[in-house]
Amino acid sequence: FPLVALGGITPSNAPSFLRLGFRRVASLGYLQGLQLSELAEAVRTFCQPRLLLCGGIDPTSEAGITADARHAERLGVRCYTILTAITRQDSEAFHGLMPLPDAEIVGQLEALRRQDPPAAAKIGLVSSLHQVGLIASCIRRLFPLCQILWDPILRTSSGYQVLEEGDRAEIDRAISAVDLL
């Protein structure tokens, strides 16, 4: 539904309208009551895009969700991060990874339910095709308007296989769970 309000919608209650399924909210009355010095920050808060990043953490911060979040925030995007795995690597070699259990990943996503909803989500490093579907279904349940991108990481540049090979049906299920590959 489109929702336009001339009063009553503030930065603190706008997310609740978005969680109810409204595509947009407007708050002219709130902005009108601000001092000129407060206006720029208020507009930025209302208009700042939100991105959900799901992936592994790289100790060097050269890859993974740390690098993704750093780049997105430089562009003015507010990021939420969901950890899927802890990697052991340096700038020269990949030494392994420890995937987080499904329940931990879902728990992290559930903890974000009261945040402003993300417009888009990026799924990066996962340890299984099953995790792609699990993460996507949880995102769709919590944030139904969120567009989901899967950027599959099959193996590292040094040849370490990150994502197990699946059969055709598993691959099709994972791909159909997301909006963009």
What are these regions (language model features)?
Residues 1-12:
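Glycine-rich beta-to-alpha transition loops that act as phosphate-gripper elements at the mouths
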Residues 123, 128-181:
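Conserved beta-alpha-beta core of the PfkB/ribokinase-like small-molecule kinase fold
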Residues 4-5, 120-124:
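Short catalytic-loop micro-motif centered on adjacent basic/acidic residues
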